[in-house]
Amino acid sequence: MGCAPSIHVSQSGVIYCRDSDESSSPRQTTSVSQGPAAPLPGLFVQTDAADAIPPSRASGPPSVARVRRARTELGSGSSAGSAAPAATTSRGRRRHCCSSAEAETQTCYTSVKQVSSAEVRIGPMRLTQDPIQVLLIFAKEDSQSDGFWWACDRAGYRCNIARTPESALECFLDKHHEIIVIDHRQTQNFDAEAVCRSIRATNPSEHTVILAVVSRVSDDHEEASVLPLLHAGFNRRFMENSSIIACYNELIQIEHGEVRSQFKLRACNSVFTALDHCHEAIEITSDDHVIQYVNPAFERMMGYHKGELLGKELADLPKSDKNRADLLDTINTCIKKGKEWQGVYYARRKSGDSIQQHVKITPVIGQGGKIRHFVSLKKLCCTTDNNKQIHKIHRDSGDNSQTEPHSFRYKNRRKESIDVKSISSRGSDAPSLQNRRYPSMARIHSMTIEAPITKVINIINAAQENSPVTVAEALDRVLEILRTTELYSPQLGTKDEDPHTSDLVGGLMTDGLRRLSGNEYVFTKNVHQSHSHLAMPITINDVPPCISQLLDNEESWDFNIFELEAITHKRPLVYLGLKVFSRFGVCEFLNCSETTLRAWFQVIEANYHSSNAYHNSTHAADVLHATAFFLGKERVKGSLDQLDEVAALIAATVHDVDHPGRTNSFLCNAGSELAVLYNDTAVLESHHTALAFQLTVKDTKCNIFKNIDRNHYRTLRQAIIDMVLATEMTKHFEHVNKFVNSINKPMAAEIEGSDCECNPAGKNFPENQILIKRMMIKCADVANPCRPLDLCIEWAGRISEEYFAQTDEEKRQGLPVVMPVFDRNTCSIPKSQISFIDYFITDMFDAWDAFAHLPALMQHLADNYKHWKTLDDLKCKSLRLPSDS
């Protein structure tokens, strides 16, 4: 049983007849308005969209009498009769159960009705459009008004009918219709163009589409121009046609055309509101640099009113003379290619003062896939020179601290960093995010000296503010990664399917992977080997002819270091070192005599342990040979100066001096004196460099540094230390990744003539020279897999034997076995070599080859890998097939 609709009378005489919210009876929502010169019964009828199309045109739109009857019937609680078919729809029911009503509606028009509430996109914005409202302004009911009324019903639009200009304007101001249809066929009742102008004079009409219904023109008359209608404020003209489908098609076209476009334009108001309240100065120009928009922050920053800027070309504005002469050309070249430009730019304010800005210019692609606009974001650099200008901007604009950007508020406490504003709330955890970040952000802002990583974090935090939630969360994860100490090192996981790789990682890349609680075991081997009696230094003429003849080939990569080891009775370092150092003019650079250099080599070689299977002076000579070979490559030679070359040769010579034949993990687990001394961090590498300098400077007879000035010595010493420490395997991936990102990629971009705005390779920059030297000695240190096959096999046997001996001692002393696969009874040497090459060698030498061009080495690497792979496929665990032994 239905409930009577409630009736409200406005002061202007408008009577609204609304459904009772508690009613569930099916009935039509109607409202009746009284115009100033009309009787009370009604001058316009509103109907919400029906769920079904009336069965016939004959039933027509409800007349005044029908509305009265519908109101009476609804008031008595009965359903509307057939005299008013629109009143018999399920609209009342839909107010209470929309989903069920839609499911029950099975007409061919249902999908059409849903269009009006479909999602609309404008750029990244998602909008939901409310059902379309249509206002029909017809002085009297006729077939044309009926046609539009039923077309609205079919399309699912809400419709109002007004009979007078006054009631039409009142209704429009109340409901803000998207479409207005005005009867322009007759002039005796009202002036259609005057009605249109009166509506256009109101603010809500800015995005309304107004349609003029004009009389059909006979064939013998010329059609009138549409310009007077457009000048009056109409958007479209509709030639009289009372067909419902013709009216329906017209309305649907308007909805998907002008109404949808106007809806998007109306949504742009929110974007402009955001721009107006943005702290960054924003400037939008056309493709030919005519200023189209500036926000209030831009006006405050530059001292201009927007009226002074809009429509002007950027070239007409005063320029600062503090910029580079070619800066504007550089910027234009970049943005004309459709690429973003970012950098520091000096701008001139209206007052004539120059201010330094962080500027980001983004091209915007428009019609035809061409650049149509440029958007510039500008922020003041908070430098000392800008402080006065910032104060002046504040004073002129009258901004208080509540509206100032952070870059202004922290102007006296920060230098040269991107502003970080308060982190906007995101999702349900926003309060916790904000509370968690604020103290740290405040501390970052208060820094007077900022590290590069701090600036990076500032930029990311600033980017989070205007990012979608998913992007902000991803940037949170980025920040967590950046706050770790191992930025370039991969996360090392255990490879169950490859125990060799797992053990190599554990044994070479960790210090004391499995520690004992109290260092119960002490490494007792004397790693500070006492000096053996040294023979008198030899002269160049004392070198035996057989050694001299062998050294004639030392510049070749295929030089056989083991032949030199045998012929020199395991003292190859002195002989090879003298030859290599002479070739690179080391004595001349250090201003030392050859006698001093020979004495130094003898002292260093004496402190290598000949009892070690691998880490002995032959390995040092091999690394020195590889380093010298790399220094002879054209690109390496062009990247380093002589001091770098001398430092590299010395570092290669001493890089493993006094090596005990055990890994860092072993020393840490054993609680050795060296591990305690160096806090379990880079134990051996720190010891090698420290001992090398101790041995060098304690005796003037072998002090090769005694004749260079203090500054040169400090620079040389730092370079040597840095290179030796780079051989520590825990930093392996960090060094390789830095080299690839800082050297290889920029160099590749240069070679390929890329248009990207990246910095040049800058190989001669000090920071890049450091990366090159680190990479060079790392490759020289583990170049065995890139040697000719016979040499590669010999080195593989030696390193395996040293690891076997360590495993034996770990078991004997009850220490953790850090590399269990290196058990001499079960180990597969081919598998261990394959794992070492796959995990450590291939990527590093690919990167080094891309820089230094080493095709012969890469071929050896491929051949050797094939050798080990063949042995492994045959289940052979030794260095060679039994038939080859």
Curated annotation (Swiss-Prot):
A Gene Ontology molecular function term of the record: 3',5'-cyclic-AMP phosphodiesterase activity
Phosphoserine carried by residues: S517, S754
Record-annotated active site: H615 (proton donor)
Free-text tissue specificity from the UniProt record: Abundantly expressed in the thyroid. Also very weakly expressed in brain, spinal cord and placenta. In the thyroid isoform 1 predominates, and isoforms 2 and 6 are also highly expressed. In the placenta isoforms 1 and 2 are expressed equally. In the brain isoform 2 predominates.
Cofactor binding: number and manner: Binds 2 divalent metal cations per subunit. Site 1 may preferentially bind zinc ions, while site 2 has a preference for magnesium and/or manganese ions.
PDEase domain ranges (all copies): 539-875
Polar residues: compositionally biased ranges: 23-34, 422-436
The PAS domain, residue ranges: 267-338
The protein's required cofactors: a divalent metal cation
Catalytic activity from the UniProt record: 3',5'-cyclic AMP + H2O = AMP + H(+)
Regulation: Inhibited by dipyridimole. Insensitive to selective PDE inhibitors including rolipram and milrinone as well as to the non-selective inhibitor, IBMX. Unaffected by cGMP.
Enzyme Commission numbers on file: 3.1.4.53
Ranges for region Disordered: 18-41, 72-95, 393-436
Enzyme class, first EC level, given as a word: hydrolase
GO process annotations (BP): behavioral fear response; cAMP catabolic process; cAMP-mediated signaling; negative regulation of insulin secretion involved in cellular response to glucose stimulus; negative regulation of steroid hormone biosynthetic process; neuromuscular process controlling balance; operant conditioning; positive regulation of ERK1 and ERK2 cascade
Residues reported to bind a divalent metal cation 1: H619, H655, D656, D781
Gene Ontology CC: cytosol
Biased composition (Low complexity): 75-90
Binding-site residues for a divalent metal cation 2, renumbered to this chain: D656
Pathway involvement of the protein, from the record: Purine metabolism; 3',5'-cyclic AMP degradation; AMP from 3',5'-cyclic AMP: step 1/1
Its biological purpose: Hydrolyzes the second messenger cAMP, which is a key regulator of many important physiological processes. May be involved in specific signaling in the thyroid gland.
Record note on domains: Composed of a C-terminal catalytic domain containing two putative divalent metal sites and an N-terminal regulatory domain.
Family assignment from sequence similarity: Belongs to the cyclic nucleotide phosphodiesterase family. PDE8 subfamily.
PANTHER family to which the protein is assigned, alphabetical: CYCLIC NUCLEOTIDE PHOSPHODIESTERASE
Disease: Striatal degeneration, autosomal dominant 1: A movement disorder affecting the striatal part of the basal ganglia and characterized by bradykinesia, dysarthria and muscle rigidity. These symptoms resemble idiopathic Parkinson disease, but tremor is not present. Primary pigmented nodular adrenocortical disease 3: A rare bilateral adrenal defect causing ACTH-independent Cushing syndrome. Macroscopic appearance of the adrenals is characteristic with small pigmented micronodules observed in the cortex. Adrenal glands show overall normal size and weight, and multiple small yellow-to-dark brown nodules surrounded by a cortex with a uniform appearance.
Listed name of the protein: High affinity cAMP-specific and IBMX-insensitive 3',5'-cyclic phosphodiesterase 8B
Lineage: Eukaryota, Metazoa, Chordata, Craniata, Vertebrata
